[in-house]
Amino acid sequence: MSTKNRDRLVVTEDSDDDNEREEMSSGGESGEEGPSSVDGGAGDADETVAFPAIERRKKKVIKKLTKKEQSLKKSVKEYRIKLALVKPDITTDREKERNLRRVATKGVVQLFNAVSDRQKTMSDAVKEKMTARERREARQRFDGKNFDSDRFADSGYVGAKKEVKGEDDDGEDQMDIGEEQIDTGNYSDED
């Protein structure tokens, strides 16, 4: 056997060219198709096998921000903080929340005291022996439409405030207090 008669196989990647396929299918000038025979045929001994190209995945390039972009990002963050678009941090605002809760509790106590005083005066006025006309006038006088907020602030508010101060006994009416003046009293109704 000579080296001319041996078949040779050439493998290439990504050969989508139509011209190469036509050359492969023609098989040479001798008119024989396929590889040459062992008995010494004069056909094209080269046969090319093509495989489809495998696309290689490109690594994502991590883009580093330029100094201008970093400063812009930082200024946007500061702007959001100024607009209070940041979620509140409970751990840092604990003292502030405690003071707000204390003020709200005092306000609720004052409101309930004022409501109970108003109901008491209204029931006392209705219980008196009156004619139907006098009762109607008394109800109109205590109706919410004729409610005088200035008179309420002058009279009812002071009485309610005294009761709250009686519970507090520290005299803390300011929001800014030091840590040594923190009131740990329980203002809930469960006592």
From Swiss-Prot:
Pfam families: Rrp15p. Residues 1-52, 119-191 are annotated as: Disordered. GO terms for cellular component: preribosome, large subunit precursor. Residues 166-191 have a biased composition (Acidic residues). InterPro entries: Rrp15. Residues 1-11, 119-153 have a biased composition (Basic and acidic residues). Keywords: Coiled coil. Belongs to the RRP15 family. Residues 53-84 form a coiled coil. It comes from the Eukaryota. One of its GO terms (biological process) is maturation of LSU-rRNA. This is RRP15-like protein.
